[in-house]
Amino acid sequence: MREPAFWYRPRSPESQILRPLGALYGAITARRMALQGFDAGIPVICVGNYHVGGAGKTPTVLALTKLLRELGETPVVLSRGYGGRLQGPVMVDGARHIAADVGDEPLMMARDVPVVVARDRLDGVALAKSQGATVILMDDGFQNPRLLKDASLIVIDSERGIGNGKVFPAGPLRAPLKAQLARTDALVLIGDGRAANDVAAELAKRNKPELRARLKPDAASVAQLFGKRVFAFAGIGDPERFFRTLRASGIDVARTRRFDDHHMFSPEEIAALAAEAQREQLTLVTTEKDLARLRGSEGVPNGIVPFAVQLEFDDPAKLRQLISDHLYKARERRFGRR
């Protein structure tokens, strides 16, 4: 779904018209969030958003995976598998699954970390534990009460913020902000923008930490594209952020094309992109998430370059201490010891 432009305007007639629906949706979601979740028996760390659309959850999950391994843990990512047909529970296998099976994000992450896809998160937990998981990393699911969460980290793009502050469909919020703030343990702000400073200030009043991070382009990806004119395309939550990252890396972006988030490319669309790039002597470049979807499509031309990024935290020691503390508290609550 492509986000309506009015979601990111302070005031709009569309938002006012939809506000009653947003109030109803928000009340239902807030009530669900207050329900007691099932205790997985091992620590559960949730990486979520306050709003619909992309904000950097996937690179945050991958960064936390790396940290947890450094701490001696065996993390397994639990995903609902948005866009995939399999109900699960299933352990994602890049050799036999495509994005249409398990979703693009799980398929992409499975290259680096064990990923379980399950519509029913309790079934997913059981499979993850059978594979030796000592920590569950929930990719999304902050508003879902099914599992008890030991820590919830909320990711926000600091350039975009949370829009007009209204609840879907009047705005991008998945639930009333107050209800979501109350269940947040830390805020991850990606980039140097100020659009989410008010949210950070509200959480600071609750003694909840703010963690600044930024997306760093992979050096090999930059080198592969250096000196070339590129045709960049993306079907993610915020394609413009991808295009900005390319330009900020010194890459000559001659043409761009945006698609809806999680867009499944048809053979005709792929052929049209390739023909346009060839006609103008451009190199096709896309995100790793988009490439995960393309790998399951017919007629994908050779030469599409995936542009890799990774999340780097400004204060890694602060993040390490935060996660260590939550793991300790989670185990102390269950077992009375570390």
From Swiss-Prot:
InterPro entries: LpxK (IPR003758), P-loop_NTPase (IPR027417). ATP binds at residues 51-58. Keywords: ATP-binding, Kinase, Lipid A biosynthesis, Lipid biosynthesis, Lipid metabolism, Nucleotide-binding, Transferase. GO terms for molecular function: ATP binding; tetraacyldisaccharide 4'-kinase activity. It comes from the Bacteria. It catalyses: a lipid A disaccharide + ATP = a lipid IVA + ADP + H(+). It is an enzyme of class 2 (transferase). GO terms for biological process: lipid A biosynthetic process; lipopolysaccharide core region biosynthetic process. Its EC number is 2.7.1.130. It holds the Pfam family LpxK. One of its GO terms (cellular component) is plasma membrane. NCBIfam families: lpxK (TIGR00682). Belongs to the LpxK family. HAMAP family: LpxK. Transfers the gamma-phosphate of ATP to the 4'-position of a tetraacyldisaccharide 1-phosphate intermediate (termed DS-1-P) to form tetraacyldisaccharide 1,4'-bis-phosphate (lipid IVA). This is Tetraacyldisaccharide 4'-kinase. It comes from Bradyrhizobium diazoefficiens (strain JCM 10833 / BCRC 13528 / IAM 13628 / NBRC 14792 / USDA 110). The gene is lpxK.
